[in-house]
Structure formats: structure tokens, C-alpha cells
């Protein structure tokens, strides 16, 4: 009886863990689309994606969004697939698309040349109404 209760608790904990981790990247394999990897510099990852046919999704071309902080640096380097960056932890979200499939890339870094990939997921940008 005690063993079955422990198994039940273990299965429950595994389920909770999977539920919270499930939205990250397709089980966050070591290599993502186009062979990108966690910790890879954004510039290198983007080059791989574009070479494999992923197209940057322009995020703020017509909505009057005002870039600030590291967002300005990304925009200056023509990374218009940038959705947003946080102010407190320098995490940024960028979007790409290929043959109807969306790709979200999350990065971290306060300087353009030091920005690295932290995760990816098959997620489309939210549409504004």
C-alpha cells in the first residue's frame, strides 16, 4: 500500500513537472530548427535559420511601437523580427516563419553581440486587434 502511494505521488509530480515544462520547445532537444543550440549567439542562430529558409517575421512595421533599451540595438541591426525585450533581465522574443510554421526564439543578453538563444518553440506571434 505504501509503495503504491509513493508511485502515485511520483507520477503526479512528473505530470506537474511536464505540464509546466511542456510549453518550452518541442522537448527542447539539443538541436533546434536549422541546428541552432541553446547558448548559441543570436547572430549565428539567425544566420542558420535564414539559410534554412526561415523568414524573419516583421513585428512592429506599422504599429508605431517605440523601441527602448536593447530593442534599439536589435532594430539598428535590422532584427525587425523582434517582438519585445524585458527591462529587468534583457530577455527578448523574436519570431520566424517557414512554410506556414511559426518559430519563437527567446534570447538573453544586454549587448547585441552577447545575446544568446535560451529556448525555442513552435509558437506564432499574437495578433493585435
Where are these regions (language model features)?
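A cross-family detector of function-defining hotspots
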Residues: 53-100
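A short, surface-exposed interaction/processing loop segment used at functional sites
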Residues: 110-129
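General secretory precursor processing signal
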Residues: 16, 88, 95, 105, ...
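Boundary at the C-terminal end of the N-terminal hydrophobic targeting segment
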Residues: 17-21
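Bacterial N-terminal signal peptides
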Residues: 7-15
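Broad, structure-driven detector of short, well-ordered beta-strand segments within folded domains
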Residues: 101-111
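Bacterial N-terminal signal peptides that target proteins for export
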Residues: 1-6
